[in-house]
């Protein structure tokens, strides 16, 4: 049970089970209608007939699933998460098609029915959320996968695949790469099956995560700065040692294990279900649930939920092919995946109804909702489906229906709770962040306070500026209704106090609200947001790239409680040196975004 640290290898050779190789997908254009309807009657009759035939006979399939060999891989289209914009709760619809080859629906259904995941996993409860149900006017049901032995659904897929391995393969051991829940699932499964497990994690993995894996008896190896480097090492070591690589989502046996969640929901809730909301990272959970339910209860909508900045499945369905995100947000780290799986995409393209996108604030609000409902704290990815369900119900005005949200995990990093607390009321629309201009005259502050009226000020920042005729006040107010905010803004404007709503501006919420010190005129300042890896030497690597070549005029570091930290940097770069600056920024390998044109920066800091 040692913890080893190595330099990452560069080889990308993989070692996966010979029974499964990835399969190609068929390109299907996305529909342009807002909400997809019920399945075509022909398809419904076909799959219902299949389901009747299968369910009436004993399930005996225990062999590992097999798939056809893959064709040569085609380079994936690289896209930005921000290239797909929609309102929270809007269903980005998918137009499902009949199967296109590969592992059949019959095989998935029979394997889910005969899965042995209950040797280690629990049949988790389906609990009603009374407070949320009353607030939304629908019956909200929570599928409590956060109550599994490793506090995540991932144990199902890992164990199902490992339990099907021949004895001689188990004796050689297993290996996986993961920075979170999949690692614990593989470690516990190996413990129960009596085999050796090596878990490869990035060196940036928080101590609490790798120590949890170590306690389960696995060997933890810390390699590389990113998941990709850890995965490359794991696959190379699997090949050299003859170990079986256990993928986190893109394998039929893993998908089958996750599909048992859908089987349980269908058994636990006898009333008609309008929709089941499923968090999506690589797609294993939603693919498994859809593979089962669309063959036994095809009228139930299966809806994926993704963060706005980690929307690989939504963009893949939009483009009709798997795509690779050029960068991915790390707040909901359990679903921070740049590319969905080949087999998971094939199933999603065939079966699911669409995807809903939600922002970070909404996820934080749902974490708070869950705490108030059940006194449980979900991780961001674990609250994702609940946020999507709430947004969908509000957008479409859904009333009186049954909706199910899968609370997929509770491995919350404690350090992240500070940020969740700050953003939860914003996500609930119970707090607004505003900026108001007022004259630098005696009595202006009192006039401002009178205009705020009875509203509760939760945050206030002001600094006198002798060089300006107007001061800028940045503040937050508590809300009961949106009408309160509209009324206050109208009062401000009628008193010639220009007021701007910055509630949806992440730059303000992450950085600028902590930097109020007055506006300044810094020549040639470029404002950038970088994501630093949480490891020693990250800052010096950054400074070596830019200093003393250019002057750093602003620096604000904000730990996020995960493997990366948000850093806001101002650097004075003459116009004729911008190309050189961008080249150096690209060479760092840190994700970054330019913020110089951000409205809030222009108002507050410049």
UniProtKB/Swiss-Prot annotation:
Q: Which residues carry this modification: N6-(pyridoxal phosphate)lysine?
A: 154
**Xref: InterPro entries:** ACT-like_dom_sf, Ser/Thr_Dehydratase, Ser/Thr_deHydtase_PyrdxlP-BS, TD_ACT-like, TD_ACT-like_sf, Thr_deHydtase_biosynth, TrpB-like_PALP, TrpB-like_PALP_sf
EC number(s) on record? Answer: 4.3.1.19
The protein's GO terms of the molecular function aspect are:
pyridoxal phosphate binding; threonine deaminase activity
Give the record's GO biological process terms.
Answer: isoleucine biosynthetic process; threonine catabolic process
Could you tell me where this protein is found in the cell? Plastid, Chloroplast
Question: Keywords, A to Z?
Answer: Amino-acid biosynthesis, Branched-chain amino acid biosynthesis, Chloroplast, Isoleucine biosynthesis, Lyase, Plastid, Pyridoxal phosphate, Repeat, Transit peptide
Share the entry's pH-dependence remark: Active at alkaline pH.
Tell me, using the record's free text, what induces this protein.
Constitutively expressed. Not induced in response to methyl jasmonate (MeJA) or mechanical wounding.
Q: How is its activity regulated?
A: Strongly inhibited by 1 mM isoleucine.
**Catalytic reaction equation(s):** L-threonine = 2-oxobutanoate + NH4(+)
| Class of enzymatic activity (EC top level) | lyase
Q: What is its main location?
A: plastid
One cellular component term from this protein's GO annotations in UniProt: chloroplast
Q: How does activity depend on temperature?
A: Optimum temperature is 16 degrees Celsius. Not active at temperatures above 55 degrees Celsius. Complete loss of activity by incubation at 55 degrees Celsius for 1 minute.
Q: Can you give the residue ranges of the ACT-like domain?
A: 432-504, 526-597
Q: In which tissues is it expressed?
A: Expressed constitutively in all tissues examined including root, stem, petiole, leaf, immature flower bud, unopened flower and opened flower with the highest expression in opened flower and lowest in leaf.
Q: Name one Pfam family in it.
A: PALP
Part of which pathway?
A: Amino-acid biosynthesis; L-isoleucine biosynthesis; 2-oxobutanoate from L-threonine: step 1/1
PROSITE patterns hit by this protein? ACT_LIKE, DEHYDRATASE_SER_THR
Which coenzymes or cofactors are required?
Answer: pyridoxal 5'-phosphate
Function, in words: Has a housekeeping role in isoleucine biosynthesis.
Q: Which family does it belong to?
A: Belongs to the serine/threonine dehydratase family.
PANTHER family noted in UniProt: THREONINE DEHYDRATASE, MITOCHONDRIAL, THREONINE DEHYDRATASE, MITOCHONDRIAL-RELATED
User: What's the protein name?
Assistant: Threonine dehydratase 1 biosynthetic, chloroplastic
